[in-house]
Protein backbone atom coordinates (compact mmCIF):
# COMPACT_ATOMS: atom_id res chain seq x y z
CA UNK A 1 0.00 0.00 0.00
CA UNK A 2 1.28 3.49 -0.82
CA UNK A 3 1.84 5.21 2.57
CA UNK A 4 0.02 8.43 1.61
CA UNK A 5 -3.26 6.58 1.05
CA UNK A 6 -5.78 6.69 3.86
CA UNK A 7 -7.67 3.63 2.61
CA UNK A 8 -6.49 0.65 0.55
CA UNK A 9 -7.21 1.08 -3.15
CA UNK A 10 -8.91 -1.85 -4.89
CA UNK A 11 -9.10 -2.04 -8.68
CA UNK A 12 -12.25 -3.94 -9.64
CA UNK A 13 -12.13 -5.39 -13.17
CA UNK A 14 -15.63 -6.59 -14.09
CA UNK A 15 -17.45 -6.21 -17.40
CA UNK A 16 -20.99 -6.70 -16.09
CA UNK A 17 -22.17 -3.27 -14.91
CA UNK A 18 -24.60 -4.46 -12.22
CA UNK A 19 -22.00 -6.73 -10.63
CA UNK A 20 -19.35 -4.00 -10.88
CA UNK A 21 -21.59 -1.52 -9.06
CA UNK A 22 -22.63 -4.06 -6.43
CA UNK A 23 -19.06 -5.13 -5.59
CA UNK A 24 -17.85 -1.53 -5.69
CA UNK A 25 -20.56 -0.52 -3.21
CA UNK A 26 -19.73 -3.47 -0.89
CA UNK A 27 -16.09 -2.49 -0.83
CA UNK A 28 -16.64 1.25 -0.43
CA UNK A 29 -19.06 0.65 2.44
CA UNK A 30 -16.33 -1.45 4.08
CA UNK A 31 -13.79 1.37 3.89
CA UNK A 32 -11.92 0.71 0.65
CA UNK A 33 -11.29 3.17 -2.16
CA UNK A 34 -12.40 1.52 -5.40
CA UNK A 35 -11.59 2.19 -9.04
CA UNK A 36 -13.08 0.11 -11.84
CA UNK A 37 -12.16 -1.34 -15.22
CA UNK A 38 -14.55 -2.80 -17.81
CA UNK A 39 -12.19 -5.34 -19.41
CA UNK A 40 -8.77 -6.90 -19.03
CA UNK A 41 -6.95 -4.39 -21.24
CA UNK A 42 -8.37 -1.49 -19.25
CA UNK A 43 -7.44 -3.29 -16.02
CA UNK A 44 -3.80 -3.47 -17.10
CA UNK A 45 -3.71 0.22 -18.05
CA UNK A 46 -5.39 1.29 -14.80
CA UNK A 47 -3.18 -0.98 -12.68
CA UNK A 48 -0.01 0.57 -14.11
CA UNK A 49 -1.43 4.07 -13.67
CA UNK A 50 -3.02 3.68 -10.22
CA UNK A 51 -0.78 1.09 -8.54
CA UNK A 52 -3.72 -0.30 -6.52
CA UNK A 53 -3.19 -2.29 -3.35
CA UNK A 54 -5.24 -5.18 -4.78
CA UNK A 55 -7.00 -6.16 -7.99
CA UNK A 56 -10.28 -8.10 -8.15
CA UNK A 57 -10.15 -9.62 -11.64
CA UNK A 58 -13.17 -11.15 -13.36
CA UNK A 59 -12.02 -14.14 -15.39
CA UNK A 60 -14.42 -13.73 -18.34
CA UNK A 61 -14.32 -10.28 -19.91
CA UNK A 62 -14.28 -8.86 -23.44
CA UNK A 63 -11.24 -7.38 -25.21
CA UNK A 64 -8.83 -9.32 -22.96
CA UNK A 65 -9.95 -11.92 -20.45
CA UNK A 66 -8.95 -11.82 -16.80
CA UNK A 67 -6.59 -14.79 -17.08
CA UNK A 68 -4.48 -13.14 -19.79
CA UNK A 69 -4.63 -9.76 -18.04
CA UNK A 70 -3.33 -11.43 -14.86
CA UNK A 71 -0.49 -13.10 -16.78
CA UNK A 72 0.54 -9.72 -18.20
CA UNK A 73 0.30 -7.94 -14.84
CA UNK A 74 2.39 -10.62 -13.09
CA UNK A 75 5.00 -10.49 -15.88
CA UNK A 76 5.38 -6.71 -15.56
CA UNK A 77 7.90 -5.57 -12.90
CA UNK A 78 5.74 -2.47 -12.28
CA UNK A 79 2.65 -4.50 -11.31
CA UNK A 80 3.82 -8.01 -10.34
CA UNK A 81 3.71 -7.16 -6.62
CA UNK A 82 -0.02 -6.32 -6.66
CA UNK A 83 -2.17 -9.12 -5.22
CA UNK A 84 -4.84 -10.32 -7.64
CA UNK A 85 -7.99 -12.17 -6.63
CA UNK A 86 -9.79 -14.04 -9.41
CA UNK A 87 -13.49 -13.21 -9.47
CA UNK A 88 -15.50 -15.85 -11.31
CA UNK A 89 -18.81 -17.66 -11.44
CA UNK A 90 -16.94 -20.90 -12.17
CA UNK A 91 -16.52 -22.67 -8.84
CA UNK A 92 -14.98 -25.82 -10.29
CA UNK A 93 -11.47 -27.01 -9.43
CA UNK A 94 -10.35 -26.32 -13.02
CA UNK A 95 -11.05 -22.61 -12.55
CA UNK A 96 -9.13 -22.57 -9.26
CA UNK A 97 -6.17 -24.32 -10.91
CA UNK A 98 -6.25 -21.86 -13.81
CA UNK A 99 -6.33 -18.93 -11.38
CA UNK A 100 -3.22 -20.23 -9.60
CA UNK A 101 -1.49 -21.05 -12.89
CA UNK A 102 -1.84 -17.50 -14.24
CA UNK A 103 -0.64 -15.95 -10.97
CA UNK A 104 -3.76 -15.09 -9.00
CA UNK A 105 -3.18 -14.82 -5.27
CA UNK A 106 -6.69 -16.00 -4.38
CA UNK A 107 -10.11 -16.87 -5.68
CA UNK A 108 -13.60 -15.46 -5.10
CA UNK A 109 -16.64 -17.30 -6.44
CA UNK A 110 -19.52 -15.08 -7.46
CA UNK A 111 -22.09 -14.40 -6.46
CA UNK A 112 -20.62 -13.98 -3.01
CA UNK A 113 -21.89 -12.51 0.20
CA UNK A 114 -20.61 -9.00 0.95
CA UNK A 115 -18.88 -10.12 4.15
CA UNK A 116 -17.15 -12.99 2.33
CA UNK A 117 -15.84 -10.64 -0.36
CA UNK A 118 -14.52 -8.15 2.19
CA UNK A 119 -12.93 -10.92 4.28
CA UNK A 120 -11.08 -12.31 1.23
CA UNK A 121 -9.94 -8.85 0.15
CA UNK A 122 -8.62 -8.04 3.64
CA UNK A 123 -6.84 -11.42 3.87
CA UNK A 124 -5.19 -10.89 0.47
CA UNK A 125 -4.08 -7.39 1.48
CA UNK A 126 -2.62 -8.74 4.73
CA UNK A 127 -0.78 -11.51 2.84
CA UNK A 128 0.53 -8.94 0.36
CA UNK A 129 1.87 -6.77 3.17
CA UNK A 130 3.60 -9.75 4.76
CA UNK A 131 5.27 -10.67 1.45
CA UNK A 132 6.46 -7.10 0.88
CA UNK A 133 8.14 -7.02 4.31
CA UNK A 134 10.27 -10.07 3.49
Task: Give residue spans per PLM region.
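Non-catalytic signal-transmission and effector/linker regions of two-component phosphorelay proteins
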Residues: 1-11, 24, 115-134
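Conserved acidic carboxylate
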Residues: 14
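Active-site beta3 strand of CheY-like receiver
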Residues: 50-56
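Charged docking surfaces used in two-component/phosphorelay signaling
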Residues: 21-29
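Short hydrophobic/Thr-rich beta-strand motif most characteristic of the beta2 strand and flanking loop
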Residues: 31-38, 46
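Receiver (REC) domain active-site loop signature in two-component systems and cognate sites
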Residues: 61
Amino acid sequence: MIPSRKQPLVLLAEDFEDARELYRDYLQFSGFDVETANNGREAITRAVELQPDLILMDASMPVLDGWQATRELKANPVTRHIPILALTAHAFDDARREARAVGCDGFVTKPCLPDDLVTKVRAALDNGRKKSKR
